[in-house]
Amino acid sequence: MENRWQVMIVWQVDRMRIRTWHSLVKHHMYVSKKAKNWFYRHHYESRHPKVSSEVHIPLGDARLVVRTYWGLQTGEKDWHLGHGVSIEWRQKRYSTQLDPDLADQLIHLYYFDCFSESAIRQAILGHIVSPRCDYQAGHNKVGSLQYLALTALIAPKKTRPPLPSVRKLTEDRWNKPQQTKGHRGSHTMNGH
């Protein structure tokens, strides 16, 4: 019998991102209880030697599986030390690969609070609108007009620790330009 190959999309990430992801998932599963019904599978529970963990997130009758890997072929950059993440959506016998943005949106559909449809009417009537979105990563780029109006009205509260975001897990933080907060230039060069 000949070998059959399967190709999977694996996002290269650094080891510390994976540790942060594990920590956030476990915190919200066991401490805050916001990720109820999620299932965490350790590396020793997997039959594949390169799988370091799996997080199963139920989405109705389907589920999202975020699988982390170790011992992969290193990438072209020095920090790609053989760690990666795959994101898979499964329903019965069907499965497909997802990108991190879509995974975060699917998680947002089933978990974590957001504005209700009646919130804008309550805001117009002058009532206090208390529901806020806890899961900012689930909103893709620019939100709807309703969402933008409500975020202008109520600043979202900071959740400590933050909720686990698949997009944040797979984000490439080295190839982004560095941003310095609050510095307009050198004080000695400006003469101040």
From Swiss-Prot:
Processed in virion by the viral protease. Highly phosphorylated on serine and threonine residues. GO terms for biological process: viral life cycle. Residues 54-72 are annotated as: Interaction with host APOBEC3F and APOBEC3G. InterPro entries: Vif. The keyword Membrane applies. Residues 151-180 are annotated as: SOCS box-like. One of its GO terms (molecular function) is RNA binding. A motif (HCCH motif) lies at residues 108-139. One of its GO terms (cellular component) is virion component. Residues 171-172 are annotated as: Membrane association. It is a peripheral membrane protein. It comes from the Viruses. Residues 159-192 are annotated as: Disordered. Zn(2+) binds at residues 108, 114, 133, 139. The record marks 150-151 as: Cleavage in virion (by viral protease). Residues 151-164 are annotated as: Multimerization. HAMAP family: HIV_VIF. The BC-like-box motif mediates the interaction with elongin BC complex. Homomultimer; in vitro and presumably in vivo. Interacts with viral RNA and Pr55Gag precursor; these interactions mediate Vif incorporation into the virion. Interacts with the viral reverse transcriptase. Forms cullin-5-RING E3 ubiquitin-protein ligase complex (ECS complex) by interacting with host CUL5, RBX2, elongin BC complex (ELOB and ELOC) and CBFB/CBF-beta. Within the ECS complex, Vif interacts directly with host CUL5, ELOC and APOBEC (APOBEC3F and APOBEC3G) substrates. Belongs to the primate lentivirus group Vif protein family. This is Virion infectivity factor. It comes from Human immunodeficiency virus type 1 group M subtype A (isolate MAL) (HIV-1).
